[in-house]
Amino acid sequence: MTGSLVVNEIYLSLQGESTFAGLPCVFIRLTACDLRCSYCDTAYAFTEGKKRELTEIFAKVRELAAPFSNSKLKAQNSKLPLVELTGGEPLLQKNSLPLMQALCNDGFTVLIETSGAHDISQIDPRVHRIMDLKCPSSGEVARNLASNIAHLNATDEIKFVIGTLEDYEWAKAQIAAHKLDSICPLLFSWVHPLAPEQQSKVLKPVPAGLTPISRKELAEKIIADALPVRFQ
């Protein structure tokens, strides 16, 4: 395996989102993103990182995942060990593709978190693709690549980050229009929209005129509308 990636960090933690939430996971955070979502909490990964050879990354993942490869937890959950590529936007670096393939070949359950702004069709089909559909408050709704929806399957997941009433209504309309619940699990993640004075100047501003929604209000709406989503 030849080539390299610019990596922000590699670490072991518990998966906090998706249908894999709560499981141990090795995270590979890659550097660079071409979106500037208003609520981004990893802006440090836009530029900070170090070039690392794929073989070095692979070895580090194996080292961190080793305790879970033969543990009792592994016997209870065959999905372990988990590895997730995140960012930043992993698909901006083409060598993320052979790395994911190699990790799958080595028996890892591989996840990728991607913005939905780049073609996902070239990703190894064994990889679980957790793809965003950017809502209005992100400031990046125009970057959604609609053609990606046709490439999703039952092992993938779609994530909506909801911070306003308009986000909720937009997400609900997308679910209905594309019958998304018949494709894969759907995730709703709540976010508190930042006031202008709280926002980093490198991020898109929250579009004017949107109505913030609280976590409680979002949960109540999901229940009232019987939406087929997982609230996280």
Enumerate the predicted regions with their spans.
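Conserved Radical SAM active-site core
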Residues: 8, 24-25, 31, 36-127
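A generic secondary-structure signal marking the coil-to-beta-strand transition
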Residues: 3, 24-26, 36, 184, ...
